[in-house]
Design a protein with these regions (language model features):
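Short, structured segments at the rim of ligand-binding sites
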Residues: 1-405
Length: 405
């Protein structure tokens, strides 16, 4: 999809979409519960479809009721899927559900998009060798076989918290006590707190023994619940960003007591509007693209903790460097930091590329509201925020969509 945006000012009120991070977690907990749960606030995004499809293939069942999903749970120890699970491009779906698949002694195959299967999976490969399980990768397929034992697990904390969260879902269902030791440095700790909150909502306890150790009692069971997904700070940031490029937008539907690490975006936006700050995004890497974009339109900034942006849906550092250059902005890039150096910010010199990355597309849309411009590959927003352009058009952003690719 190609979108042509003309310079326009956003004004009005917008409701934040449901939190993708929390929705994944609550759906998995519901599927692991005995009986029927209702999860309210589920979008029709690609990532939500991926998690629901994979849970269904493992043995759960679900029905959509408007923006809610009714889930009937299954026993993962009895799971024996006959066809590959399809996580599409969702890293959360794949990494959360591999340990769930390990709970049975049966073989499970995941078949994902090439961009997903290029993302690191070494942590699970190592754990399989250590625990006597199997893990094989062949092109776009990963095949695993358990069963998952209780015990001690050592996991690197600086690759992705998703590996740790995956174990947190599965280990409470094993027979004995387990310990997860996290090797520092620990990044994205806030995502582990989201996992703990989701588990707690369904009656499962995972406790911090210290800053680097999680203790998990075995023999626990998930209890069916009715829960509501809170608003998504990471996607709300793209709506709120219009306030920093001349707009006047009120974003509602966010919980002030949220555990989401991306809630820091408001403080970071204020810092960008007041100078040329140095900001650490190690605990909120999904904010990287929009922060780079606002820095380019403003006075610049330096961002640390950027290493993991290279292993997202795209290499987000390279993607933003490429696209911001079209606006006249240079990036100084090192292994774990990015400095945005604004020069003569101008109308993009050529069409912008979405890099098959929803957050790149939405960041470019915010900038194009200032300068105008064309974004190619804008369909990538379907991954997390399929109605993004409908929401921004309701705010007054002038966007013309065509089905050209």
């Amino acid at each position: 999809m190609r979108v042509r945006i003309t310079p326009s000012r956003a004004e009005g009120c917008a409701v934040a979409p449901p939190s993708k991070s929390m929705a994944h977690r609550l759906l998995i907990c519901a599927a692991l519960s005995e009986g029927e749960s209702l999860v309210e606030g589920i979008s029709c995004s690609e990532d939500m479809g991926a998690t629901l499809d994979c849970l269904s293939a493992l043995g759960a069942s679900y029905t959509r009721e408007g923006n809610a999903v009714r889930v009937r749970g299954f026993d993962p120890r009895m799971s024996n899927p006959k066809t590959p699970l399809l996580p599409r491009e969702s890293g959360s779906t794949l990494r959360f559900l591999i340990p769930v698949a390990w709970l049975s002694g049966n073989e499970t195959t995941f078949r994902g998009a090439p961009t997903l299967m290029r993302r690191p999976m070494d942590i699970y490969q190592v754990l399989c060798r250590e625990k006597g399980m199997t893990f094989s990768k062949n092109g776009c397929e990963i095949t695993v076989k358990g069963g998952l034992p209780s015990g001690e697990y050592c996991v690197a904390g600086n690759v992705s918290s998703q590996f740790i969260s995956g174990l947190m879902f599965a280990l409470p269902l094993t027979d004995g006590e387990s310990i997860i030791r996290i090797m520092p440095p620990v990044e994205s700790r806030s995502y582990l707190e989201l996992t703990r909150a989701a588990l707690s909502a369904f009656g499962v306890r995972v406790e911090w023994e210290n800053d680097l150790t999680l203790r998990i009692a075995g023999g626990q069971s998930y209890r069916a619940r009715r829960v509501t997904v809170e608003g998504d700070y990471s996607n709300a940031a793209f709506l709120d960003a219009f306030n920093y490029v001349g707009g006047k937008v009120t974003v509602t539907g966010l919980s002030e007591g949220s555990l989401q690490g991306d809630r820091v975006y408001r403080r970071y936006f204020e810092a960008l509007s007041g100078g040329t700050p140095t900001l650490d995004i190690g605990d909120c890497p999904d904010l990287g693209p929009i922060l780079f974009a606002l820095a380019a339109a403003g006075r610049g900034a330096t961002f640390t903790g950027t290493r993991r942006l290279r292993i997202k849906e795209s290499d987000r550092v390279l993607a933003m460097e490429t696209e911001l250059k079209k606006f006249g902005t240079e990036l100084e890039v090192s292994e774990d930091s990015v400095t945005v150096i604004p020069t003569a910010f101008h109308v993009p010199s050529e069409p912008l590329c979405g890099h098959n990355d929803h957050r790149i597309v939405m960041s470019m849309a915010v900038l194009c509201s200032i300068t105008g411009g064309v974004i190619e590959g804008a369909e990538a927003i379907a991954k997390s925020f399929p109605d993004f352009f409908e929401k921004t058009e309701a705010l007054g952003i002038k966007a013309e969509k065509t089905n050209e690719f």
